[in-house]
Design a protein with these regions (language model features):
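ALDH superfamily catalytic-core signature
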Residues: 3, 7, 46-49, 133-137, ...
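N-terminal Rossmann-like NAD(P)+-binding subdomain of aldehyde/semialdehyde dehydrogenases
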Residues: 1-117
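Short, well-ordered beta-strand elements within core beta-sheets of diverse protein domains
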Residues: 19-25, 270-272, 321-330, 345-350
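Short, structured coil segments at secondary-structure junctions
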Residues: 149, 203-204, 223-224, 290, ...
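Conserved small-residue-rich beta-alpha loop and adjacent elements
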Residues: 91, 95-175, 179, 224-228
């Protein structure tokens, strides 16, 4: 463990780890009950009033930061917490509570020899450190997944959501205490220095989850020896193949971009090829009507002069706003090459009625989510039926895509014997049976 970690943060982490062990050993129904209790608490008028009042204070303070130019207006959209968002979070908690418990599940049982049985059994990762952006609803999602899987969690939200996070953390602590569990299983850290301190807790913290800007994620990865789960960018593509249906293309483009422009799974680049002009025309018309600023290549602008010229860095930009880059490609091979070079391995989609082209796209694009005739916005733990997500990972290890319950578990090997020793096996000795049970 690095000496950078503060004494307070180290003590908080050790206390959280101990609380997490008790949570891990609690009956599955207790962990599921915690989530139901939390969902019910968030539906109480008094709790909602306190949470919304705290959120209003955060938003009011953020307006001053926007005026000073120290905060983006798009960040405030993520910060806002309303009844609809809270209801969605509660639904996710109920969905998680209803899932079969995955902790302690035997995923392999093998006889090595008569009376020597090997089992692979799922277990929690242990203690997570989660650093997340402005969205206060993310705190509840993260805590819900951690509690359901028997993990403890250190939470560090952004300064802009400080009041909201305090209010939500208080609800979580009340629910844990009411069940007779240690509220330190979910610790809210507020000092900016705590981030560096948590990153230095290798040997205590088992996983870091980083949710924020590309620059921030790169900083986290470079500053810790703890495994990091994150996505560094959300540059998602929608590719209009020549066999794309215009009406479908337009609907997918608008939903992918405008249902929530600040989301990491929002569309950032629209690709089209010769033969897809009708789909392009319908898509751009619908996007313009939805208030999207279009930035295009020369070929796109030749067909649609109202489109603004795309700067050199357009294809590598995650706008997080109602702005979209549009580029013509020669064919599917150039589309694949563009996505390989400029994509972030998050989510990319093809629009086509050609099954061969769809299959090629689905097998060739190396992203966490690869879609055919579907909006990029489906890349979400709740929509995948995971109940919630701790984040979206563009890594290939240990989890990929929306990270739900499975991504917060690892496994142990349990061996049941009757005094066997390795010296009994080998040349001239006993033979392993290696029979799956």
């Amino acid at each position: 463990m690095s000496e950078v970690a503060s004494t307070f943060t180290q003590e908080a982490a050790l206390a959280a780890k101990a609380a997490g062990a008790a949570l891990r050993d609690a009956p599955p129904e207790t962990r599921a009950g915690l989530l139901r209790d939390l969902a019910e608490a968030l539906a109480r008028p008094a709790v909602q009033a306190a949470v919304f009042a705290a959120n209003a204070r955060d938003i009011e303070r953020s307006k001053g930061d926007i005026a000073k130019g120290t905060m983006s207006p798009d960040l405030v959209k993520r910060l806002a917490l309303d009844a609809k968002k809270l209801a969605a979070v509660s639904d996710g908690l109920q969905q998680l509570a209803a899932m079969s418990d995955l902790v302690g599940r035997v995923t392999l049982r093998r006889e090595l020899d008569d009376g020597l049985i090997l089992e692979r059994v799922t277990c929690p990762l242990g203690l997570m450190g989660v650093v997340f952006e402005a969205r206060p609803d993310a705190l509840v999602q993260i805590v819900g997944l951690a509690l359901r899987t028997g993990n403890a969690v250190l939470l560090k939200g952004g300064r802009e959501a400080q009041e909201s996070n305090r209010a939500l953390a208080a609800v979580v602590h009340d629910v844990l205490s009411a069940r007779g569990l240690d509220p330190r299983a979910a610790v809210l850290l507020e000092d900016r220095a705590d981030v560096s301190a948590v990153l230095a807790l290798d040997g205590i913290v088992d996983l870091i989850v980083a949710r924020g800007s590309s620059e921030f994620v790169r900083h986290v990865r470079a500053s810790t020896r703890i495994p990091v789960m994150a996505h560094a960018a959300g540059i998602c593509h929608l590719y209009l193949h020549r066999a794309a249906q215009p009406a479908m293309a337009a609907r997918l483009a608008v939903d992918s971009k405008m249902s929530y422009p600040a989301a990491c799974n929002a569309l950032e680049t629209l690709l089209w090829e010769p033969g897809a002009e009708a789909a392009l025309d319908a898509s751009l018309q619908a996007l313009l009507a939805s208030g999207v600023e279009l930035r295009g290549c020369p070929e796109t602008r030749a067909r649609h002069p109202h489109v603004v010229a795309a700067p050199d860095d357009a294809w590598d930009t995650e706008y997080g706003a109602p702005i979209l880059s549009v580029r013509r490609v020669r064919d599917i091979d150039e589309a694949l090459a563009h996505i390989e070079r400029h994509g972030s391995r998050h989510t990319d989609s093809i629009v086509t009625e050609d099954a061969v082209a769809a299959r090629k796209f689905l097998t060739s694009v190396d992203s966490a989510g690869v879609y055919h005739n579907a909006s990029t916005r489906f890349s979400d733990g709740y929509r995948y039926g995971l109940g919630a997500e701790v984040g979206i990972s563009t890594d290939k290890l240990h989890a990929r895509g929306p990270v739900g319950v499975d991504g917060l578990l690892t496994y142990r090997w349990l061996l049941h014997g009757h005094g066997q020793v390795t010296a009994d096996y080998g040349v001239g000795g006993k033979r392993f049976t290696h029979r799956d049970l």
